[in-house]
Curated annotation (Swiss-Prot):
Identification of the protein by name: Cytochrome c
InterPro entries reported in the protein's UniProt record: Cyt_c-like_dom, Cyt_c-like_dom_sf, Cyt_c_1A/1B
Protein's cellular compartments: Mitochondrion intermembrane space
UniProt cross-references to PROSITE patterns, sorted A to Z: CYTC (PS51007)
Encoding gene, per UniProt annotation: cyc
The UniProt record lists the keyword Phosphoprotein: no
Post-translational modification: Binds 1 heme c group covalently per subunit.
Gene3D superfamilies the UniProt entry points to: Cytochrome c-like domain
Segment forming the signal sequence: none
Coiled-coil residue spans: none
Source superkingdom: Eukaryota
Membership in a protein family: Belongs to the cytochrome c family.
Gene Ontology cellular-component terms listed: mitochondrial intermembrane space
Residues annotated with N-acetylglycine modification: G2
Length: 104
């Protein structure tokens, strides 16, 4: 799908301020992302989600993450993720590839 090394760079620049990826990592402003793939929205244990995230009910995978990361507030209206999104498809593909490798 994407380039893991480029995706890691994107994660560090755009995501790491609010998220961790390692097993047992702390929640920050956003939830720890370990185990993200195959998990339903709003399910990271110990993180306080909005009702919008909890009730969205989709399962995170390559396709749902590609859509969400383009415009988080459009995909889940009411999310507290303040990130505007990544418009470039290739950059999102790289990030999703990195997340898949780093969170499982």
């Amino acid at each position: 799908m994407g380039d893991v090394a480029k995706g890691k760079k994107t994660f560090v620049q755009k995501c790491a301020q609010c998220h961790t990826v390692e097993n047992g990592g702390k929640h920050k402003v956003g939830p720890n992302l370990w185990g993200l793939f195959g998990r339903k929205t709003g399910q990271a244990e110990g993180y306080s989600y909005t009702d919008a995230n909890k009730s969205k009910g989709i399962v995170w995978n390559e396709n749902t993450l590609m859509e969400y990361l383009e415009n988080p507030k459009k995909y889940i209206p009411g999310t507290k993720m303040i990130f505007a999104g990544i418009k470039k498809k290739g950059e999102r593909q790289d990030l999703v590839a990195y997340l898949k490798s780093a969170t499982s």
